[in-house]
């Protein structure tokens, strides 16, 4: 097993700005936010997507906010800028042989689960690694529960950035208190 100081986890969560019924007539962040789909919640939403890079212990290393329609793969390089961790755990949204090859050339090893119908899925999808990957889902749940991150009242980019920075700072300070 790899030492935990070499592993980081990458994932994203939706940041909706309104209820789905208002998706096509909302005016806030016009031209910046757009409509995207969240497969795990089976939900079309208007807003942004927050992509995060987190350590196994839960410390948030980096984050990027994009329009909701931006695919997870397009943000990987920006998230990994300056990352010292060499093993990156992702979900099915990062399953791409091209991305894996590109990251290996940069010195990273990307692990993503295989789809159930892919050859070798049972051997590859080790429950221990899948359990490690759940760390980021726990962090997202904490951000929602403790800081209500999915409900933003920001009405401009400066306000949104300030809110995200405050939430991440508070989360990371809380992380240091616990450890």
Indicate residue ranges for each PLM-predicted region.
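Short alpha-helical elements
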Residues: 1-179
